[in-house]
């Protein structure tokens, strides 16, 4: 779950499937830290499932979904995952889901606290999000 303004990663989960449960866990974790006016996602079944959308509705968050097959509608999230892949996953060649999870537990704090973004005037996501 990404704050688009600051690029701050509020929460994340990892799964070998595209089931709703792991996405809902990430959303619940993010909602413990912050709420938003709008939640944008693609139209994947995990994001359109009642279990997921009801969490958004219960927190008065407007649901916004990209057009089918339009990855550029969600450009900040797509860019995050490109960074994750090229800066961590492809370099480390994780062999198992558990190794990947452990590696990402180290990467996301780096991404939020240390990785500077040109679009943020070379500030970190944490600095923008917290100030």
Sequence positions of predicted segments:
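Charged DNA-binding/catalytic regions of mobile-element recombinases
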Residues: 1-131
């Amino acid at each position: 779950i990404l704050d688009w303004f600051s690029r701050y990663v509020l929460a994340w989960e990892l799964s070998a499937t595209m089931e709703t449960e792991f996405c809902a866990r990430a959303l619940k974790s993010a909602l413990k830290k912050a709420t938003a006016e709008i939640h944008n996602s693609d139209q994947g079944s995990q994001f359109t499932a009642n279990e997921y959308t009801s969490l958004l509705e219960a927190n008065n968050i407007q649901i916004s979904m990209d057009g089918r097959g339009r990855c550029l509608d969600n450009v900040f999230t797509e860019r995050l995952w490109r960074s994750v892949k090229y800066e961590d996953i492809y370099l480390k060649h994780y062999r198992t889901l558990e190794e990947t999870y452990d590696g990402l537990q180290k990467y996301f704090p780096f991404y939020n606290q240390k990785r500077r973004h040109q679009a943020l005037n070379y500030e970190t996501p944490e600095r923008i999000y917290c100030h």
